[in-house]
Regions:
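Thiamine diphosphate
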Residues: 1-128
Length: 128
């Protein structure tokens, strides 16, 4: 015989936020951007529109166009630009609107980012 375990929500000192996934992502991006000026958000319609699912709503207004960048409709270009920014010390966050569009962009990670150190004879380091 066992008593049911107490849920973490049942403890008096625990605060649980009731957020949508989009709102939670927005708050996490905002906190990251406040903590680190090298965090940049980029993607299609992430600026004034706030992203297709409004995940980036208000970020461009608060952090400026130089940190929340609207990009052309070119997922491979978005990720390739992010790779270059990361190598230079920035912390880019890419929004790819739909998972079906990530496959062409994955080449930037597997064929470019993964080989930068060797192609540059060690001058460029991967950002991790």
């Amino acid at each position: 015989m066992a008593a049911p375990a107490a849920s973490p929500v049942d403890t008096p000192d625990t605060k649980v936020a009731n957020l949508t996934i989009g709102k939670a992502l927005n708050e996490a991006l905002r906190a990251s951007m406040e903590a680190d000026p090298k965090v940049i958000v980029m993607g299609e319609d992430v600026g004034k529109l706030g992203g297709v699912f409004r995940v980036t709503d208000g970020l461009q207004k608060d952090f400026g166009e130089h940190r929340v960048l609207d990009t052309p409709l070119a997922e491979s270009g978005i990720v390739g630009t992010a790779v270059g920014l990361a190598v230079r010390g920035f912390r880019p966050v890419c929004e790819i609107q739909f998972e079906g569009f990530i496959f062409p962009a994955f080449d930037q990670i597997s064929s470019q980012l993964a080989k930068l150190r060797y192609r540059s004879q060690g001058r460029l380091k991967r950002p991790w």
